[in-house]
Amino acid sequence: MKRKLFKSMWLAMLLVAFAGYGTEKNAVVPQMNLPKTEAAAKAVPFYEQEYANVVDSVYKFIANGNSDNLPEQGRTGICEVRDFAKREAALQQLGYTLQDISGDGVPELLIGWISQKRGVGHYGKEIYAIYTFADGRVKYVAEGWSRSSLQLMANDNLVTRGGTGISHQVLAVEHLQPDGNLGCYELYFTWPKDDGLGVYRNMSCRSEADAAQETDMTVEEFNEMRSEYANHSVEIEFLPLKDFKKQGFKGLMRQYLSAGR
């Protein structure tokens, strides 16, 4: 009875997390072309100029290995791409976009993996780095890589699924706050115990057993919940890194990127 009650609770949690998801399995964050005027061309927001410096540093790193200006934080997944993909493939499949996920009207910079092309659009779910603009500067938010998947939900929650081995797997649900910091909704993780593995939960995103409450969830149920989050994450439309030098951020909505969703 206790397990059925807990399972009902986390299913309810999933329904809340997926609120706003809609009826399509792969919700797509759209891009919008704005009228190009001379005045708009001159009025480039300062955050966009600063984000352009970050994207330019990633472009140079992928293109020729120059990491002089590559941000120290948020480079793990980007370095993996350069290590395992050929130069041209990396420039084609690594993408960038601007999207307001904190709700403050100023977009974040998202860098991620392009998994498919449909029409003229390039789409993917895996995010390698997120940067925000707070206190007049670019600020690192979060990163993903091969063993720590970072994805976006339809309600702009960020979901991390990763781990350091079969005995320590993590599912974290967080949200970017307007001050540039991540707020933790909750975290589930596995941890060794006397008779095998336990599944724990806390609300502070600390993955230590002594800082969390053990649940009645089985490891199989935990893995099922992780899969549900992955299935309901949204696709993001990226601009390929290879086009950055000639395109910049052209084609992306400025300032109020969540308004067209």
Give, region by region, the residue ranges found by the protein language model.
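Beta-propeller blade termini
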Residues: 92-101, 147-158
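Bacterial N-terminal signal peptides that target proteins for export
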Residues: 2-10
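Acidic/hydrophobic-patterned starts of short beta strands in beta-sheet-rich repeat architectures
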Residues: 102-114, 156-161
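Surface-exposed loop/turn elements that mediate protein-protein interactions on large endomembrane-trafficking
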Residues: 127-142, 173-186
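Acidic, small-residue rich beta-repeat scaffolds with periodic aromatic anchors
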Residues: 22-65, 161-261
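Blade-edge motifs of beta-propeller repeat domains
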Residues: 32-90, 135-149
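Short consensus segments that form the blades of beta-propeller domains
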Residues: 85-89, 116-123, 162-165
